[in-house]
């Protein structure tokens, strides 16, 4: 499994390099394409080593210790021991939208982040189910490719935004000599966000089913995880997340963003109803009925 994740991460980095070189060639020819190649090498390095910090910074997440959040920290520590994992760092996101995600490049450098809203609406059993889900992502090493994909998707959309305005104003300054930059800007504005979302879609939705099963078995409470998923889904529909970056949607236990933006054209998660039904079957296997 580790080798597959490494290969998929390498493919994502190669895709980013190709996209950046293509944008550079479109707006500046071979010289700019080469500069973008060098930049992509630097960005790939930063993404691998620091993507978790990048993602956490998008949500103003704060690392806490066992003295600041004793109950949450104890749950993470105890379930990590049960899963045979080193205890990950714990972060709290200042958002009232209930949700959670895991990030990091490997189990030794992992972080489990939860929102204030999640801590507010879930009971202890439900919280254990959610933490178990995130720990399964860590154990299965989903966090590397998920975090790298989020950082890359965010970078692609941001670079496309900059390139669009640079091309438009640059085109005007050259008296619209051939309109090429304007056409290029339009193409980038349309295609780059789609490329970013396709990168997100490359993160298999089946990973969520596996993480649900793992979370149910680690916590021993599939019914509580099912209840948590329902609560989160209902709360997100009522109060979708406004802060952060849609490029991270696939990282959360439930997609926290709603609406008709490009970020929602590609589904990042299986339907919550299907996940709950699978948890019901897992519960029956464990002799639990709900």
UniProtKB/Swiss-Prot annotation:
Question: Which cofactors go with this protein?
Answer: Zn(2+)
Presence of the UniProt keyword Transmembrane in the record: yes
* MF GO annotations: metalloendopeptidase activity; zinc ion binding
InterPro entries on file: HtpX_protease, Pept_M48_protease_HtpX, Peptidase_M48
The EC class name is: hydrolase
**Cofactor note from UniProt?**
Binds 1 zinc ion per subunit.
Q: What is its main location?
A: membrane
Read off the Pfam families from this record. Answer: Peptidase_M48 (PF01435)
Where do the annotations place Zn(2+) binding? 133, 137, 208
Q: How does it sit in the membrane?
A: Multi-pass membrane protein
Q: Which family does it belong to?
A: Belongs to the peptidase M48B family.
Q: What is this protein called?
A: Protease HtpX homolog
* Organism annotation: Thermococcus kodakarensis (strain ATCC BAA-918 / JCM 12380 / KOD1) (Pyrococcus kodakaraensis (strain KOD1))
């Amino acid at each position: 499994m580790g080798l597959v994740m490494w290969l998929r991460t390498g493919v994502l980095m190669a895709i980013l390099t190709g996209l950046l070189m293509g944008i550079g060639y479109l707006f500046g020819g071979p010289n700019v394409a080469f500069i973008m190649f060098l930049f992509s090498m630097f960005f790939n390095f930063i993404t691998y080593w620091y993507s978790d910090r990048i993602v956490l910074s998008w949500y103003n997440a704060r690392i806490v210790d066992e003295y600041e959040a004793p109950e949450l920290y104890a749950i993470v520590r105890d379930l990590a021991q049960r899963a045979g994992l080193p205890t990950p760092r714990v972060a709290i996101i200042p958002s009232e939208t209930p949700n959670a995600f895991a990030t990091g490049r490997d189990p030794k450098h992992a972080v489990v982040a939860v929102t204030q809203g999640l801590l507010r609406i879930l009971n202890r059993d439900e919280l254990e189910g959610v933490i178990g889900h995130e720990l399964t992502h860590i154990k299965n090493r989903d966090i590397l490719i998920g975090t790298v994909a989020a950082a890359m998707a965010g970078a692609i959309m941001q670079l496309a935004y900059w390139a669009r305005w640079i091309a438009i104003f640059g085109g005007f300054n050259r008296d619209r000599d051939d309109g090429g930059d304007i056409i290029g800007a339009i193409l980038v504005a349309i295609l780059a966000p789609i490329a970013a979302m396709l990168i997100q879609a490359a993160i298999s939705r089946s990973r969520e089913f596996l993480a649900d099963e793992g979370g149910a078995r680690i916590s021993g409470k599939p019914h509580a995880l099912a209840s948590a998923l329902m609560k989160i889904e209902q709360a997100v529909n009522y109060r979708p997340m406004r802060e952060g970056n849609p490029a991270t949607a696939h990282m959360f236990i439930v997609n926290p963003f709603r609406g008709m933006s490009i970020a929602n054209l590609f589904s990042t998660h299986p339907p919550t109803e299907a996940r709950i039904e699978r948890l019901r079957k897992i519960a029956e296997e464990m002799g639990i009925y709900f």
